[in-house]
C-alpha cells in the first residue's frame, strides 16, 4: 500500500486500542501516544439552534498533542473516560452559533446524533494542527463515550504521538510500524 505519514496505509487504519498499549510499552522514545476517532456530518443542536459539526473522541492526554485554550470549563478528564460520561467540550464556532455572547455553556445540554451531552467546557483554540478537522467546529467527547455512542468497538482512526526530546519522529515510525 501507499505510505501515509510514513505508515503503511492498511496498518494505519486498522489500529485497535490494544495496539496503543503495545506501542506505549515497546516504543520508549514516545512521550505521549493517544488515539482519536472522528465522525463528520453531524449537527450540534441547542434549543432551536443547529450547527454542522464533527464529533471527536479523545483522551485527556490529547492536551499534550494540541493544547486547548479553555474559555469556559475544562477538558475531558480520566473520570469522564472511566465512566464513559455523556459530556462534551464544544469548539468556538459551535459556541458562537448556539449560545448568546458571554453565556456560560457549562451545564447546558447539546444534542448530537440523537444523544444529549452535558457541556463541560468550551475551547477557544482554532486548532492549527487540524487533526481530523478544525477544533473550533468539533464536539469533543470522552473517547470511551464515543466508542459506545457510535458502536466503534476497539477501532481507532488516528494515533497522535509526540517524541521525547531529542528524538526525531522519523526515527520512531519504523519502530511503530512493527
Question: What spans do the regions from the language model cover?
Answer:
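Mid-to-C-terminal secondary-structure elements
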Residues: 54-56, 60-80, 84-178
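Hydrophobic, regular-secondary-structure patches
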Residues: 1-54, 61-64, 96-97, 147-148, ...
Amino acid at each position: 500500500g501507499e505510505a501515509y505519514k510514513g505508515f503503511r496505509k492498511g496498518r494505519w487504519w486498522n489500529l485497535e486500542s490494544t495496539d496503543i498499549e503495545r506501542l506505549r510499552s515497546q516504543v520508549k522514545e514516545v512521550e505521549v501516544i493517544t488515539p482519536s476517532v472522528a465522525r463528520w456530518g453531524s449537527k450540534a443542536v441547542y434549543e432551536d439552534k443547529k450547527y454542522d459539526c464533527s464529533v471527536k473522541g479523545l483522551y485527556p492526554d490529547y492536551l499534550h498533542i494540541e493544547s486547548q485554550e479553555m474559555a469556559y470549563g475544562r477538558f475531558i478528564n480520566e473520570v469522564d473516560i472511566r465512566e464513559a460520561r455523556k459530556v462534551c467540550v464544544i469548539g468556538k464556532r459551535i459556541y458562537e452559533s448556539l449560545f448568546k455572547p458571554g453565556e456560560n455553556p457549562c451545564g447546558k445540554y447539546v444534542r448530537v446524533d440523537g444523544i444529549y451531552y452535558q457541556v463541560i467546557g468550551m475551547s477557544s483554540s482554532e486548532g492549527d494542527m487540524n487533526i481530523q478537522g478544525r477544533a473550533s467546529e468539533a464536539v469533543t467527547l470522552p473517547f470511551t463515550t464515543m466508542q459506545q455512542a457510535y458502536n466503534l468497538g476497539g477501532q481507532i482512526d488516528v494515533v497522535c504521538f509526540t517524541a521525547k526530546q531529542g528524538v526525531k519522529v522519523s526515527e520512531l515510525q519504523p519502530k511503530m510500524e512493527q
